[in-house]
Amino acid sequence: MFSECAFLKKIDLSKFDTSQVVDMSRMFYECYELENLDLSNFDTSKVIDMSKMFAGCFALKKLDVSNFNTKNVEDMSSMFDGCCLMEELNLENFYTDKVTNMSYMFNGCQNLKKLNIIHFNSTNINKMDGIFEGCSKLTELKSSK
């Protein structure tokens, strides 16, 4: 939808209706200058694909996905790939029971220090290569068992 909007800096999506969306892949792909994004109002209950959703958002520092419902998502590959300025990411409400692909999910998040993935379930995942590749500053990881 906003894929390759390279000069997009700000966007208000508070009234955006996503209740029928099943594919959010590449939604903000390569939005190089986007710094803050509040998606707390997004209805993601029907979404199956979130691959590369924020990939290449090099300037993204703050991202609110606190109300995402990920119970039907199957693909999260490269979701945050290249979000190199993000220091903290709270995915506390992400449930990943149906996810099969998480490869390169956080690849290149070189400034990521805190990550909350407390409800991640890797039972059905068959691709997880490079998931934390390049996350050299990651010091706080909250995960399940």
Question: What residue ranges belong to the model's regions?
Answer:
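Register-specific detector for alpha-helical tandem repeat solenoids, activating on a conserved position
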Residues: 22-26, 48-52, 74-78, 103-104, ...
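Structural signature of tandem-repeat unit edges
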Residues: 7-22, 33-48, 59-74, 84-100, ...
